[in-house]
Amino acid sequence: MAPKTPDASEIFHALAGNWTLVRDLGEVGQFTGDVTFHAADPDQPNVLRYREEGFLTRPDGKRFDGYREYDFVLHKDPAAIELLFRDPLSFGNRYVLLQFGEEGDAGESGLCARDIHPCGEDFYHHCMIWNGPDHFETKIKITGPKKDHLLHSIYRRAYHPERRDILS
């Protein structure tokens, strides 16, 4: 019997907790850091706050600290996870709406969700690949007159002694 394919709700609830992040930014460098998904408000169980913090290391060796925040909102109809910006310029605006259900591209395992975010004249082709409760990836291909590069992020569950249930 084939294993059950997780739905958006199962993926959403599995995100809660701490993760490590490695993001390849191509010629720009690499971002490494930590990510936390936590309940933003006890009265809104369908919202997880995402916060990443870490360092961008450029090819010339210079390092810069940085962070980013989103709200991940679980929707039931259609079953999806919506990412909302939290930065001051775009606060509350939709980044992408992820509906899981397709297989990953050739050479990828996992369940994939895709959406496109327009940003001025550029487009962010977002793909989230769910490999299980301890590992997921995002691939964001940015195209347009101002940008043309790929952001590949790998998320792995961070080890915490009090959460032995999430270890594999």
What are these regions (language model features)?
Residues A2-S168:
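Soluble ligand-binding/transfer domains with enclosed cavities or grooves
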